[in-house]
Amino acid sequence: MTRNLISFIYALLLSLPLTSCNANGAGSETPVISDNGENTPLINETRPIPDGYGQDANEQGSIVRIDYDTRDYAEGTGMARTNTAYVYLPYGYDAQKQYNILYFVHGHYSTAASTFEDEDGAVCKLLDQMIAHGDIDPMIVVTPSYNYGQPTSNYADADPYCRALPQELVNDLIPIVESRYHTYAKTTDTEGIEASRDHRAIGGFSMGAVTTWYAFDETLNAFRYFMPVSGDCWSLGRFAGMNRPDDTAAYLAERVQQSPYAGNGFYIWAASGTNDSAYSEILLQIEGMARLADVFNATNMTFHQKEGARHEFRPIPEYLYNALPFFFPKSNE
């Protein structure tokens, strides 16, 4: 089956009525066709976290605070400033080994520390348990912040700060973290970061998802995997992914086609809960992108939903439990 025929079938299927699962449990999945000829759903239900993964593991990773120098990328002054990020290091971190790495951005009214603190440290416990059970290789997780001091009073007003964070990551935080800790980056200049992008992911919740879409738009050369949770792309304006899904899809498709990463050079693992206030925001955009099947299809984009989940931190560990083994499958070593 040729790629053109695959794309045609994919687009034809997406033109059919789509019913997503809702709080009442009714729904269906729209099938799409992958390059290998297998049926792959665009919309997927998340798998629940196994019992016991919310408990402290015998072997626990550590959290390190990093205060680093950066500058104003958002307000246009270019003035020097400092920011803070937190780094999860797996138990037994070995400076001689290479580690995959995820940068995960908090939602509004939260901080860089929130991801590792909320729900009694649920994300830390999850990472420890996933590593202990062999679901993933030991990996590093970094939680940065887009806040310049206190969060803006209106979450939507954080837009310019969310847009600025990917540049801050690439220019300032990634070089610090990945020169201090051993990832797959042989160097932390632009060339070294791009050469190691297959082992780097970025994700975020709510306004962190908006940040993730900006990273896809503006720093595709630095990350291969993208995990926007409950937030749409604002590159064409606030809530444009929801309100202008086809325009947003066309814009992002052009950005991909201008890069060397079209096809399988990236993966978007989007997610939300069926009772999440931002569910339609991100799903409408994903459906718009899926209509451009020559650029966005099951080989590089899927949507994952948790039945009944709301717009809160509580389901984040389940999204991570489902996404991380996909980004970074367990090695045979």
Label each PLM-derived region with a short phrase.
Residues 27-333:
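Non-catalytic cap/lid and distal C-terminal segments of serine-dependent acyl enzymes
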Residues 13-15:
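Secretory targeting and sorting signals
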Residues 1-9:
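Bacterial N-terminal signal peptides that target proteins for export
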Residues 22-24:
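Bacterial signal peptide processing site
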Residues 18-20:
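C-terminal motif of bacterial Sec signal peptides marking the signal peptidase cleavage site
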